[in-house]
Amino acid sequence: MAGWFSSTSLLDEQVERATSSSLEDIALNLEISDLIRSKSVQPKEAMRSLKRRLENRNPNVQIATLKLTDTCVKNGGSHFLAEIASREFMDNLVSLLTTEGAPLNTDVKEKMLELIQDWAMAAQGRMDLNYLGETYRRLQSEGFRFPPKNEISGSMLESSAPPEWIDSDVCMRCRTPFSFMNRKHHCRNCGNVFDAQCSSKTLPLPHLGILQPVRVDDGCYAKLTSKSSLPSNLSDRSAFKNHSITKANAMEPRGARAEGGFDDDLRRALQLSLEEAQNKGSSGYVPSTRINDEPAKTTTQANHEEEEDADLKAAIEASLRDMEEHKKKHAAALKSNAAATDSSARDTTAATPLPKNPYELSPVEVENIHLFAALVDRLQHQPPGTILREPQIQELYESIGALRPKLARSYGETMSKHDTLLDLHAKLSTVVRYYDRMLEERLSSAYSQHSLGYGTVPGGSPYPNMYPTMPSHVPEGKTGAENFYYGNPVADRAPPVNNTYGYPQSSRDIREPAAAPSGPISSGMYNQPSQAVPQNPPWNGNAPSVASPQPSAPSTPFPNNPSGYPGPSASTQYYASAPHPEQDPNAYSSPRPGETDISHQPSPIMRRDSYYQSAGAPVTARASAPEQSPPTDQGQSPAYMQYGDSHPVQSTGQPTPQYQPTAPPPQSYYFQHQPQQSAPLPTHSQTPGAPHGTYPGGDVSPISAPAHAVHYQQVAPTKPAVEESLIEL
């Protein structure tokens, strides 16, 4: 009881001296607030002492007590602030304002209303101090007139105070269990619990309002005394980090860093940033460029650094150095550009500096923004109220807040440039895609033309690979017409393939009769193949299957040796005098006397489906003028006429194997030696009663093959000399 009264009387004495009617003693007020913050005095007793002092009738004492209370509220810690926001203290103030007895002094009343308004404004958003706001709103509703509002941040009520003690069963440094012999002790700096071995050191803690030496653990002692040299022990470093984490989790005001290197460095950086913001033309943070040139000064500054703040300071210094280098490079670029412009336009106009965007942020402003962001991010991990003890941060915040319109305009221009860039990139991508497609199309076209160049397909042949390849050499240097008669002997021919579909007739497959020699030609001059004459229906595209021919008795067979054909000497004399089929165009247009109006033409189906090839040299295409089809009469089949005229003429560039039947003598000039395996083809169906020596006057089938020589003998003027020579052979 005596101790309690003695402590209360000690605080009361200090309060009486601080609130005397004389001038305000600021130093004594701060001492009282340090006692409250260090928890040397219970916060409730301090609140009651101030409440009793307000009962004094002297207005000066009341005003001094209100000022002392405001100082203790701003520096006494959250535990004392909770007592001030209690109903006991606030209701006492309201009762003083609403008393009906002795009226309250006007100055005291105004001061009281001002403090209530400031405390309520600073306590917004804090649930433990909500009664301050309720009292303020109640007084407003009752009609009290408050002075103009002052914008006060809630951090003004924050202050550093000793943390709350944490209980544990083991030492939080060496993990040794506590026992009857191993007592637990609390560190006054961090609030953690340690044994006697880990907390045997004592230090005063002025940043917490503790001026006398108190017990601290080894980690806090190393941190507080390592301002001149960094801790060399790894365990101390880990313990220091553990204490910092524990203290941050406790959400208590920060520890012994009021006089640490972080505050000094932060204050110095803020001061330099403000100077740069005010003086836009300055060269920036000059001392940062001299760090490498002054190692002694750097070492001195490093001695005052704290370990956890080294990274932040290094980042700030690096950013300042980068900004300085960027400014130098920019200035050099401006000078070079100005010099180049001056040299090029010296005769016309003076050199003008590059146009600068008025909304572009200067390097100093950009650096201030980055510095403020780094500081805010760093202070987020600090206890509440730390930012308020540094007025330079508030000034930096105000200077950066003025840059918001400028930053918004710059951001808008950057976004428009970005959109333009995206549009141009999309257009460029489209153009490149179209260009690649064009290149691919041209490349494929070039490949197709290159592949076609290796084997040229004839223009009029729908089936270019239908016939086998024929040798191109001509034996003994004889002409194409003579090669038909100087080749190997004609062997048996293979039967043709039964194909019911016709193929287009080539112009060079049609061998037209030339001008017949004068005088009759004997039918016995050429031996015709002996074969049966089947009944052939009219040409309608459905040809019957070709059967193997049976030899006929009255027919004269082919000779087995080539002696039956004209010899070389006779043929040379005879066929050299024979007119060329294309020399007389009138030979195709008008028939001769005694001939029928229908000219016999070999069937295109017979020539297309023929698998015969010459045993010797192939028939070489004549390089003369194109051959013309002879006119046909009404007796020819209309289907055959339409089919023969509807297909293109085959190109003469490729030799075509042919089977030339033994027909009228003019067609015998072009008879071709055939391969060995062969069979006769169907012939024309002869009209009953038709005289020998004339063509049939009825339907002429295009697939008709040569029949007996008398069927195809043509009445024409003869040449006796040639006939006699052939008969002799």
Swiss-Prot record:
Record's keyword terms, sorted: Endosome, Membrane, Metal-binding, Repeat, Zinc, Zinc-finger
| Similarity annotation | Belongs to the VPS27 family.
Question: Which parts of the sequence belong to the UIM domain?
Answer: 261-280, 307-326
Record field: compositional bias (Polar residues)? 279-290, 497-507, 520-534, 626-639, 671-688
Q: Where are the zinc fingers (FYVE-type)?
A: 165-225
- Biased-composition ranges for Pro residues? 551-560
Is the keyword Nucleus in the record?
no
Instruction: Quote the biased-composition stretches of kind Low complexity, using this chain's numbering.
Output: 333-352, 650-661
Coiled coil regions in record:
none
Cell location: Endosome membrane
> What quaternary structure, including any partners, is listed in this protein's UniProt entry?
Component of the ESCRT-0 complex composed of HSE1 and VPS27.
InterPro entries, per the entry: ENTH_VHS, HGS/VPS27, UIM_dom, VHS_dom, Vps27_GAT-like, Znf_FYVE, Znf_FYVE-rel, Znf_FYVE_PHD
Q: What is this protein called?
A: Vacuolar protein sorting-associated protein 27
| Residues covered by region (Disordered) | 276-310, 323-358, 485-709
One GO molecular-function entry: zinc ion binding
Name a GO CC annotation attached to this entry.
Answer: ESCRT-0 complex
Protein task: Component of the ESCRT-0 complex which is the sorting receptor for ubiquitinated cargo proteins at the multivesicular body (MVB) and recruits ESCRT-I to the MVB outer membrane.
Matches recorded under Pfam families = FYVE, UIM, VHS, Vps27_GAT-like
Q: What is its main location?
A: membrane
